[in-house]
Amino acid sequence: MEGIEESFAPLSPKSPFARRNGRSLRIQRLVDCQHFHYSSVELGPVRVAIIAINADENATERIKMRVESESNSWLVERSREDWAVFDRQLHRCVFERRHSRLDELFPLIHLETAKFEEVLVKYTERLSELTGSIITCYPVLKFLEIDSRGGHFEPAEETSINVPAIAAAVVTKDFEPTESSQLRLRVGDIVSITEMSTASPSEQTFWKAKLTISNQKIVDPQNARLGFEIGYFPRDCVMLIDDKRLPNPLNNEQKASTRNARRYMTTMFRNRRREPIFGLELTDLYMRTGKKVPVIVEKCCASIEDQGIVTGIYRQCGIQSNIQRLRAKFDSGAEPDLHEFGQRDIYSVSSLLKQYFRQLPNPLFTYQAYPKLIEAFEKEDSLSEKVESLRFSLETMPEAHYRTAKFLMEHLTRLCKSKSLTDMTSKNLAIVWSPNLFRPPPTLNGADTHLLSGLNVHTAICDFFIENSESLFVNDIDEEQSKCTSVENSFTTISKSATMSDMRSESESKWPRFFRGKSVEGFWKFNRKQQTSTGELCGSPTSEVKWRSRSTRSHSTDAAFQSSRTDSFIQLMHTGMDQIREGMRIFRARARSMRPTSRPPPSPRTRRARFSNGSSNNVQKLNESDIQHEIPLATTEPSITPEPKNTVDPHQIMTRTISVNDSDDQSFEENGLREMRERKVMFKAATQEHVATFHERSSPVEEWSSDSRESLHLEMSRYDNVSPSGTITRNQREPITNLSPAAQMLFFESSRASHLFSA
């Protein structure tokens, strides 16, 4: 094995971090170009010069260059592919290509040797002018074999030492050994951990590691082990390195042909859980999402401009529970409805935005640009000269930081225009925002000497940025803009997005976004909406009847009918079985009660009448043939009466006499079924008027219903003047005494008469 090798074998009990969540911890090799940034570096001028391009014993082309730093020089050999990866890493983490003005090497790696050498000569000359303490990226420094103090280091993978390691770490605090078995550490050194021992909380924990990268000089060049010692040190002196490697485009092209669908789907489902955005570098978030301005910044600023013009915005704090709830939603990849949330607690939205910028590892105005900004601001120049120097310093920041700062400062400038309503001037906003946007770079000894002295300067420069945002942030380059670079007396187009969003595949987020889409409820509503629109456009008689029945419902009925079907089943899936049963029971009851065909329950009086009539079953029905037989006699021979002496004109006053024998009811109950007794209708003259009244019902629906025939179920509040067949309207009801005898009897059909007179 060579260097720090990977091993999946079970580790000793002294390595508690060997397994995480039941899965083996992958041991990273330092040669795999793990990506991390030093918290601070001490680099002077670094000179890089191309010596020659030669072929080695394997006929592989190697580019030899000389690196000079801290009055030392050494030779480094790299390939064309190494230079292309270095160029992309340099412009991903350190420089913007618009500021560095360096040619992109990846499209030029297939040039002839002489032409490519000329390109590299120009490249290294420009690179030597840009190097300095701004370079904190470990892969960039490793390419030049420079440590954090500007000295030369030889990676352990290129030496004869071979010690299995389980992790790599960077030293964050100096440590002086007190025993011979301990290591002497300095800030910026790299160690390869070989053993992670545990101890009680009251004791100090020591780890064992190999000093991989150090500023110590190798005394004996023949023995490379002298510069790489193994020993113990306190665990709080180092920080483990997470693997954030830049994907190699050459390897991606080779692997694209061999990738199958099963592996792609497995990777997709495995990576469905999104990483949080709080505490994530702006450049890393941009590489992941492709957005120059984070979504949380756009959403919060839009919500505050719409609903946050209130007193003390950004000064008053919101409710902590609401802030944590919003943060959890953004970290999970969701986008909460800030418009609805802002109506209740807009101060929580403003506090969330400040918390996001406060937790950035590298502040919005980066550590690298901090000295230049302070120096340009403190110069006693005119306003135009100060704006010009600050603009130049701002353009050196990474593009994600520059665009986000431009967006935020323009938002604060618009907010200052409503200072009469918010009581927040540019000075007040600067006092609130400056601690979240400006932080002095950390020092090697960990002493923040500029923290207190820089507070006033931070407030002043933030106030200046808010008042002059239109003049400072003007160099805005479009996403699709490209620029031409001269290469060997010709012009080649280099796309600006070649080092940014185009490096990631656009197809990686399509399928996961589909599976992480809206809920089943929303999908069901969308499908149902399409079916409804299709049914309305259809010209069939069935769809026409359905459309008419929907339009006859009132707005309140429609709203209640629709709300009964919007209960989400997904919410019930997270509860117990008892709650699911109760929810289904309530859901069915609500749906049943909201149906258009449902009728109100009958009154207690109607129920008692139905029960008494149905249980005794002793109602004698009127024979339709008898009614038809008696009525013609009354109409054709009105003078024939049982008492001819007292003849009275039948048109004067008419009554109905219905003879019902009480003894028949008792005999009917005793003997069971019996032939219905014939009911006679007679007309006689009388001095006293007897008027038969209708059987009134308490329910308006029951008033128009009958047991023998179904009627249309209509809203009685809208159709009071509609007379269904076999009924009369309320407004046209007249006493029976005003009708002729024939009209009186023809009005009541047999089934209708039996129902009315049986009550």
UniProtKB/Swiss-Prot annotation:
Record GO biological process: positive regulation of GTPase activity; signal transduction
Distribution of this protein across tissues and organs: Expressed in coelomocytes, excretory cells, uterine-seam cells and GLR cells.
UniProt region (Disordered), positions on chain: 591-624
Entry keyword set: GTPase activation, SH3 domain
Residue numbers marked as site, Arginine finger: R315
Biased composition (Polar residues): 612-622
One Pfam family hit: RhoGAP
Ranges for domain Rho-GAP: 280-473
Keyword Protein biosynthesis: no
Top-level taxon of the source organism: Eukaryota
Residue span, SH3 domain: 164-243
MF terms in GO: GTPase activator activity
InterPro entries, A to Z: PX-Rho_GAP, Rho_GTPase_activation_prot, RhoGAP_dom, SH3-like_dom_sf, SH3_domain
Function: Functions as a GTPase-activating protein (GAP) for ced-10/rac-1 and CDC42.
PANTHER family: CDC42 GTPASE-ACTIVATING PROTEIN, GTPASE-ACTIVATING PROTEIN CDGAPR
Protein name as catalogued: GTPase-activating protein rrc-1
Species in which this protein is naturally found: Caenorhabditis elegans
Gene that this sequence comes from: rrc-1
